Curated annotation (Swiss-Prot):
Gene Ontology cellular-component annotations: cytosol
Gene Ontology BP term (one): 'de novo' pyrimidine nucleobase biosynthetic process
Enzyme class (EC, first level): transferase
Protein name as catalogued: Aspartate carbamoyltransferase catalytic subunit
Binding site for L-aspartate: 87, 182, 253
Family that this chain belongs to: Belongs to the aspartate/ornithine carbamoyltransferase superfamily. ATCase family.
Chain sites annotated for binding carbamoyl phosphate: 59-60, 109, 142, 145, 294-295
E.C. number(s) listed in UniProt: 2.1.3.2
Gene that this sequence comes from: pyrB
Pathway(s) annotated for this protein in UniProt: Pyrimidine metabolism; UMP biosynthesis via de novo pathway; (S)-dihydroorotate from bicarbonate: step 2/3
Complexes and interactors: Heterododecamer (2C3:3R2) of six catalytic PyrB chains organized as two trimers (C3), and six regulatory PyrI chains organized as three dimers (R2).
Keywords associated with the record: Pyrimidine biosynthesis, Transferase
Species in which this protein is naturally found: Prochlorococcus marinus (strain SARG / CCMP1375 / SS120)
Domain of life: Bacteria
Catalytic activity: carbamoyl phosphate + L-aspartate = N-carbamoyl-L-aspartate + phosphate + H(+)
Length: 338
């Protein structure tokens, strides 16, 4: 906590290994609190957390709101359909309304890439002591999902002592619609920062050839990468090649709502070539976990049988881990605000 320096959490590109360690350790402390009584902590009593979701969400929004309530914060929820957006109000107008109401942290999800960052810059220019936490923006970033996936994997590899160090040297495959996935981008930052080597796998239409260079550029506004020994990123078009000797698999939803009709015409062919099943996991050569950020298209990204196999599928773990991870982020951003 003493070394935490982030006023906003917009993506994970500027996170140091110490930042990841801080978040994982704090989330683990929140997760291990005895599940008895009210299960609430007074840590953020008197703080106001507002969830401003300009784009639909079930898991992320519910998780953030439950996380805030478990820290005893007041929660205000924003729904575009019941707002003044239909009257011409801009996202900044909406944000400033909640700032005027005394909000300490604004969790913002928006379909436009870069909108949370623009809002954060506007608040800083106005010298407002209010934090923006990106709940997912366009194709850019979904930092809390990247962190909860990291936390879930650290638990799998060492349940007694979850730590980013647990994934150093591991080979992790990310399979599916990487082109349209803000989750993939956040996972690339977090996993490689902690020393994992990532292989990206998908058809050319969903995985550009130059995507492996994504983590090579310095983070926005910085001269150099804060990570000294970042893991490597490679691309494979062959699922068997990608899964061979892999230690964990993250499969991604086909975001059909973001695709043109001819981008991926045959879903059966996609499942046959890139779908994760019990049979395809044999290529890993060992027992490996499978993660998915949800919602899952059954029989496309992964088989229904695998989805329901809790000895392999960590999807339920991801959902439950989302709460302590988001508790940690809300605490780090708002605990020191007056």
């Amino acid at each position: 906590m003493s070394n935490w320096s982030h006023k906003h959490i917009l993506d994970l590109s500027s996170f140091s290994i110490e930042d990841y360690q801080t978040v994982v350790e704090l989330a683990n402390r929140f997760k291990t609190i005895p599940r008895s009584g009210s299960r609430k902590l007074p840590a953020l009593q008197g703080r106001l957390i507002a969830t401003l979701f300009f784009e639909p969400s079930t898991r992320t929004r519910s998780s953030f709101e439950l996380a805030a309530k478990r820290l005893s914060a007041d929660v205000q929820s924003f729904a575009p359909s019941n707002s003044s957006l239909i009257k011409g109000e801009t996202p900044l107008d909406t944000v400033m309304t909640y700032v005027a109401m005394g909000a300490h942290v604004l969790v913002v999800r928006h379909g436009g890439t870069g909108v949370p960052e623009q809002l954060a810059k506007s608040l800083d220019q106005k010298k407002k002591n209010v934090s923006i936490l990106n709940g997912g923006d366009g194709l850019h970033s979904h930092p809390s999902q990247g962190l909860l996936d990291l936390f879930t994997l650290t638990q799998f590899f060492n349940k007694e002592s979850p730590s980013p160090r647990n994934i150093a040297g591991k080979r992790i495959a990310i399979v599916g619609d990487i082109l349209h996935s803000r989750v993939a981008r956040s996972n690339l930052w977090s996993l490689t920062a902690c020393g994992a080597n990532v292989v990206l796998c998908g058809p050319p239409s969903l995985l550009p050839d130059d995507f492996a260079k994504f983590v090579e550029a310095p983070p926005s506004g910085q001269k150099k990468d804060p990570i000294k020994n970042r893991g490597k990123v490679t691309i494979s078009r062959c699922l068997k090649e990608a899964l061979t000797d892999t230690d964990a698999v993250i499969t991604l939803r086909l975001q059909k709502e973001r695709m043109s009709e001819n981008l991926l015409s045959n879903l059966d062919k996609y499942h046959n070539e890139y779908g994760i099943t019990h049979e395809s996991l044999k290529w890993c050569g060992k027992h490996v976990p499978v993660l998915h950020p949800g919602p899952v298209n059954r029989g496309i990204e992964m088989s229904s049988e695998l989805l329901e196999d809790n000895s392999i599928s960590l999807i339920e773990n991801q959902v439950s881990n989302g709460i302590p991870i988001r508790m940690a982020l809300l605490y780090l951003l708002s605990a020191d605000k007056n």
